[in-house]
Amino acid sequence: MYHYVEDKGFLKRAQKTCSGLMAELEDELRENDINSQFFLVGSGARNMVTQNEQEPIDFDYNLSIISCEDINDCKAIKELVREAFNKVLRNNSLNDCDDSTSSLTTKKIYFTDYSLVEFSIDVCIVTRDKNGNWFRLKHDKGYNSYYDKYYWNESPNSDKYSEKAKAIKSAPGWWEVVRKHYLDIKNDYLKKNDYNHPSFVCYIQAVNDVYNQMRQKRIL
């Protein structure tokens, strides 16, 4: 079952390690004429990091491409980022990352003096257009690399959920209701062996449910 990670010391140390690797990635990309900026997203950014029993913890980062030679050459961008990230990982005695459809994921990382908890980094490559819309770089793999597709896929607008979360936090005690409900939702899906609802979807559901409950009670 999922539980919140309460060890603040570990979280601070792990996120510092992850951010250090991401900063090195930024520097490496700059040498390849790619200007980028990373930021922590997901449960790590919301201080809602969960762990399923003793399974590894994931820290999600977005790597925003600010400028490069050709923003539309998605394959070149993905490959340059992947190669640069692998170089950074090797320089830190870590294994190469895995390349999935929408992210680059490190192998499991652990501290030698605290090996009970493993963690990994998921890096999504994103960019923002002049209208403020966010796009995620996706890599659809064919049965061989010749048929692979690389493209920018527009991400759902999360502004309205941020506004709802802000409204909930303005009422004392109600954010704890969101935290509990979020954990309940994740565990309900886990009991059903439903792995089609990622953490962000569970978070949106929790925010919507609590926000609607507060509206019905005329708290908002």
What is the role of each PLM region?
Residues 100, 113-220:
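Right-hand nucleic-acid polymerase module
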Residues 29-32, 78-131:
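Conserved catalytic core of two-metal-ion nucleotidyltransferases
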